[in-house]
Amino acid sequence: MKFVDEFRDPELITKAAEEIRRLADPNRHYRLMEVCGGHTHAIYRFGLKDVLPTNIELIHGPGCPVCVLPMGRIDDALSLAMNPDVIFAAFGDMMRVPGTHGSPLEHKARGMDVRIVYSPSDAIKLARMNPQKHVMFFAIGFETTAPSTALTLQRAKAEGVHNFSVFCNHVTIIPAIRAILDSPDMRLDGFIGPGHVSTVIGCRPYEWIAKNEHKPIVVCGFEPLDLLQSIVMILAQLQKGEAKVENQYKRVVPWEGNRAALKAMADTFQLRPYFEWRGLGFISQSALRIRDEYAEWDSEQRFHVPGIRVTDPKAAQCGEVLKGVLKPAQCKLFGKECTPENPVGALMVSSEGSCAAYYNYEHRKANLVTTLSSPA
């Protein structure tokens, strides 16, 4: 398959791994952050950590939108959906994310009208099929998914779909990276830049990382060779004492991004003054709110939102894992009280969560090795 097979070619992967070993200074410890949760899963899925030198440490970043959502936002939306005339619609990733009083799926078991949709336009269809009810779409994601929400809001207004609104939780990636770099306990040498987000925003917004923070950043694809090539490019910059933005994912990511998608977002959203991120606290201008022109389709403007603020369960260490301070397995609950079957935190639920990735690929593998090596 074009653009897949060649990026999984064993010979090319071996050559890239050899180039990494050649470039890596054995007297230096490298800490590289992969920002995107999709990269985290690819790293574990393809076993890439096993081919890297031991002095290259990959740090998992905050690029999982479900994971960074504070519990209070889930509680706010579910409180609105307690109304029997409201249908709560969301992507499947959200269904098992716990709020204070349970996940949307658990609320569904108690009688709440909760539906899985696969796109915002599905939520509009749901509203048309249920004219006697109000459909509230729980929108989530970085700039990757925000344009589709924006276009759906424009469509709802144009077509006069009045029993539909969006509970907007879209966040932006650049302020999150800035918050990571501002953290006093985080030392990083470079970034593996997000692929999906960059298809929308392009590469230019990352230039401040190179210019002001003197950190290399390479926008990267999701195949094994993509990730290894990106590490080669970062190491080459570090060896030369350079810090710049490079685009390894040129087959998908244009330097200037997707202008039509950016325009749709600008026409429909504006920046919030601040927004709470799980593990990172309140970050200024880091999330999107719906413009007043679309107030009728904004759940937060249309209904009274409690503005609930809650803390994560005390024993859970989601914040430290999200910031890259702890590895998933270093959390006290990991693999014990917190598993994919019984998640305590969002990082164990989402398809992009680092805890879910580690559990599914590393933890299970370690348990299998232990079982096979144990005497009968």
Task: Describe each region flagged by the PLM.
Residues M129-K133, R155-H162, S183-R187, K215, ...:
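Secondary-structure boundary elements
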Residues F138, F142-P205:
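Phosphate/pyrophosphate-binding betaalpha-module
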Residues E6, C67, F138, F142, ...:
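Hydrophobic alpha-helical scaffolding
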Residues L228-E320:
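Internal helical hairpin/lid segments
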Residues M1-Q132, A146, A150, Q154-E159, ...:
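Metallocofactor- and cofactor-centric catalytic cores in central/energy metabolism, strongly enriched
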Residues F167, D185-P254:
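A conserved active-site cap/scaffold subdomain adjacent to cofactor or substrate pockets
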